[in-house]
């Protein structure tokens, strides 16, 4: 029960980018309290770290809020390079974590490997389906992918930016050429295109052509 509430709160916090939305835990008996104290949630970042002002940071803030709500302590470990991923996840397994959040598609292979080897641990991966064999399901039953259609939020941003612009020109830029990055810019462009179509305008997008 505690684990389910924590997962719900984590998902809500990541999606809203501000706060956990899980229900507050009910007053518990001594036995339930002991069960809660045995629950150890953990999180590992990708190479961006938890101060990236993006999905690593938002995931960390969501997991922290959920852990606080449940009265438990979040164990976190940051990666600085891709070579850190496997060792960091293994360290959380050794730490006795019951649930491990892996942030970003770059940790997909490591998550699948660790989840397969540790079926009693729950894994939550952010922004990846953990579906290496493309059968429409995560490659281990104990993996819960959290995927969000971020193009929808970017669409609204593009539409509003186009309406706000006095110069008739708006810009966007991304980091590396990854699908989880370009999806933001795709949605932004679609919002501008929709604004132009419905308002009869010709606001120009600089920095991304959708290709």
Predicted regions and their residues:
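Bacterial N-terminal signal peptides that target proteins for export
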Residues: 1-8
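Repetitive helical segments and hydrophobic/amphipathic motifs
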Residues: 11-12
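C-terminal motif of bacterial Sec signal peptides marking the signal peptidase cleavage site
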Residues: 15-20
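A residue-level marker of the well-folded mature domains of exported/periplasmic proteins
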Residues: 23-211
């Amino acid at each position: 029960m505690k684990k389910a509430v924590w997962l719900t709160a984590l998902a809500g916090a990541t999606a809203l980018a501000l706060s956990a939305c899980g229900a507050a835990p009910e007053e518990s008996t001594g036995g339930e309290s002991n069960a809660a104290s045995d629950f150890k949630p953990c999180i590992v970042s990708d190479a961006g770290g938890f101060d990236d002002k993006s999905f690593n940071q938002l995931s960390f803030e969501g997991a922290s809020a959920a852990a606080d709500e449940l009265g438990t302590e979040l164990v976190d470990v940051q990666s600085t390079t891709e070579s850190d991923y496997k060792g960091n996840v293994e360290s959380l397994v050794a730490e006795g974590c019951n649930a491990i959040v892996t942030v970003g598609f770059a940790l997909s292979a490591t998550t699948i490997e660790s989840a397969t080897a540790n079926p009693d641990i729950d894994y939550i991966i952010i922004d990846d389906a953990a579906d290496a064999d493309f059968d429409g399901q995560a490659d281990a039953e104990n993996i819960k992918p959290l995927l969000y259609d971020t193009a929808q939020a970017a669409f609204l941003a593009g539409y509003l930016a186009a309406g706000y612009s006095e110069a008739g020109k708006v810009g966007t830029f991304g980091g590396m050429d990854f699908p989880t990055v370009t999806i933001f810019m795709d949605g932004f462009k679609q919002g501008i295109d929709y604004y132009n179509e419905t308002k009869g305008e010709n606001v120009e997008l600089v920095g991304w052509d959708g290709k």
